[in-house]
Amino acid sequence: LNAQDRSQARRDFGFTDETELIVGISRLVPRKGFDTAIRAVAKLKSTRPNLVLAIAGSGRDRERLEKLARELDAPVTFLGRVAHDDLPKLYGCADIYTMLCRNRWAGLEQEGFGIVFVEAAACGIPQIAGSSGGAAEAVSHGETGFVVEQSDDVEQVARYMETLLNDPELRQRMGVASRERAVNEFSYEMLAERLGNVFGVWS
């Protein structure tokens, strides 16, 4: 989004240009790790009065997450379901995208390929991810964002959030790298070409 469209998108979702906006978009289940994100922004709120974690989506974990946010007085906004056509605006007006996905049931429940990270990347937004399953493949640590080794490590998550929020140039570089990687490695055309090569379709 250009600056004008970004400002308008923020107003549409109830935020301002001054908001330090971290966005998470997902089905709300324990594996997605939004409880860790809530704890992290709660730690940062005293020094970052404009910080907001905006969580879009619905699911069985929403009630627990809302209760946690209230208990911690965390700067969290629950947006509920966001229309598919509005998702690019929500991604595009964020400073950071996060989903701290974790393994559960001794690794039997893991994150699949992190398509939401690719969607955020395509919008030029750096990401903070958990290390479960394909999420760590979707985010290139130190290049397009950060991957947290232990998804419950609130201190590390808060440090990565601060690193990005404190450094607009780093966010810009990671955003550009994210966009390039999304186009060059994860576009439908590139994936179709790779599958074609694997199965000999184009030979």
Task: State each model region's role.
Residues F117, A122, P126-A129, V139:
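Short hydrophobic beta-strand element within catalytic cores of glycosyltransferases
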Residues N184, Y188-S203:
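C-terminal alpha-helical cap of glycosyltransferases
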Residues I22, A37-V41, L53, V157, ...:
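A structural motif in glycosyltransferase catalytic domains
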Residues L1-R11:
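Acidic anion/phosphate-binding donor-loop and adjacent secondary structure
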Residues E63-P88, I96:
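Nucleotide-activated donor-binding/catalytic signature segment of Leloir-type glycosyltransferases, i.e.
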Residues T16-K32, I38-A42:
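Conserved donor-binding/catalytic core segment of Leloir-type glycosyltransferases
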Residues G92-Q110, I125:
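Acidic donor-binding loop of glycosyltransferase active sites
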